[in-house]
């Protein structure tokens, strides 16, 4: 569903009615992590209980509405419009961290494979 042109209240209502999901934000060029932070954790829920890692650059947390067991979000603390804007050092940090987390998830959940989506 295209969310462009909708105000926050309309988007929040659609979320509460389970009529949209994270992919709808991404498809509409709306950062779901920023929307979540700006709207009282409406998408991912209270991250304090599920925060796996946080530092000055990145955060990693389990989401409250996972697509599968072990579904995590790794995001930069600073918002970037797209990956082209991310400084190389931060991009490297995110991907090295993602690889570490993918190995942990694979072992914890005995997965055959783990996927990284941007």
Residues covered by each model-derived region:
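Active-site helix/loop of acyl-thioester processing domains in fatty-acid/polyketide metabolism
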Residues: 94-108
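Active-site microenvironments that recognize anionic phosphate/pyrophosphate groups
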Residues: 1-80
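A short glycine-rich, hydrophobically flanked beta-strand micro-motif that places a catalytic Asp/Glu
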Residues: 109-118
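Short histidine-centered catalytic/ligand-binding loop motif
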Residues: 72-95
């Amino acid at each position: 569903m295209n969310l462009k042109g909708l105000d926050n209240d309309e988007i929040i209502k659609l979320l509460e009615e389970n009529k949209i999901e994270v992919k709808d934000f991404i498809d509409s060029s709306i950062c779901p992590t920023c929307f979540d932070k700006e709207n009282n954790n409406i998408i991912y829920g209270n991250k304090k209980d599920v925060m796996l890692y946080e530092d000055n650059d990145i955060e990693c947390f389990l989401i409250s509405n996972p697509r599968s067991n072990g579904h995590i979000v790794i995001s930069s603390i600073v918002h970037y419009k797209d990956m082209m804007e991310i400084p190389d050092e931060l991009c490297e940090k995110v991907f090295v961290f993602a690889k570490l987390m993918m190995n942990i998830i694979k072992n914890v959940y005995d997965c055959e494979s783990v996927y990284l989506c941007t």
